[in-house]
A protein has these predicted regions:
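N-terminal Sec-pathway targeting helices
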Residues: 3-18
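Active-site metal-binding motif and surrounding structural segment of the metallo-beta-lactamase
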Residues: 57-62, 69-122
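Short, flexible/disordered intra-domain loops and linkers
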Residues: 124-135
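Intrinsically disordered, low-complexity coil segments
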Residues: 41-50, 107-112, 127-129, 146-148
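Alpha-helical transmembrane signal-anchor helices
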Residues: 14, 18-28
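Conserved glycine-bearing catalytic or ligand-binding loops at nucleotide- and phosphate-handling centers
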Residues: 133-151, 155
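Core dinuclear metal-dependent hydrolase active-site scaffold
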Residues: 24-84, 149-196
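Short Gly/charged-rich anion-binding patches and loops
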Residues: 74, 100, 139-142, 157
């Protein structure tokens, strides 16, 4: 009789452990599916650059800056390997080490870009406040003034919330025309990314 009780208790414990394992595994898989994948690209030259890509829960691609023109190939490969489409592209500011890859990819590839968020001053402001960047600024504005690009540009405001699948981007800072020292860097868009 005691042996039957012990066997019954062992069976109940085994069933409970199995249930806990199944539920735990299911919760782990559910949490795991909420992950995003963030890629920080390395420079392909000896020069500095900044480029990130985020792959959301449903496989949407979000790019932040992208790097130099010379870095475009690695970013293009990443985007192509992940479906060939950028849902949202954030350009923080028009320095070539941030926006150069965007200039190349938006002009010379079949990659589809749906939305482009940037907070940009007019061209004369950049030319006045950082004349040493004239060539870069001229090239950048030549690209963004093309109809196929201009129609996709959205200028966010501070505290705007942009939802892309399971991520939320909050705009913390935008252009600052009153700051003319290190003007382009100090007029960068600042974005906070949160995973939901």
């Amino acid at each position: 009789n005691n042996m039957k009780k012990k066997n019954k208790i062992v069976k109940i414990i085994a069933i409970l452990v199995l249930i806990i394992l199944v539920i735990g595994t299911g919760l782990y898989i559910k949490r795991r599916n909420n992950y995003i994948y963030i890629t920080q690209f390395s420079p392909t030259t000896s020069r500095q650059m900044m480029g990130y890509a985020i792959k959301t829960l449903n496989g949407k691609i979000v790019v932040i800056d992208g790097g130099l023109q010379e870095d475009a190939k690695q970013l293009e490969k990443y985007i192509t390997d992940n479906g060939g489409e950028v849902d949202t592209w954030f350009i923080t500011h028009p320095h070539i080490d941030h926006a150069g890859a965007f200039e190349i990819i938006s002009q010379n590839t079949s990659i589809k870009i749906n939305k482009i968020y940037m907070s940009i001053e007019d061209k004369d402001w950049y030319l006045t406040n950082e004349p040493s960047r004239t060539i870069d600024i001229e090239e950048f504005f030549k690209v963004i003034n093309q109809e196929k690009i201009a129609e996709k540009i959205i200028e966010p405001q501070v505290n705007d919330i942009i939802k892309i699948d399971n991520i939320t981007a909050k705009i913390l800072g935008t252009k600052n025309p009153e700051i003319t020292t290190n003007a382009i860097n100090n007029s960068s868009m600042v974005i906070q990314i949160q995973v939901n």
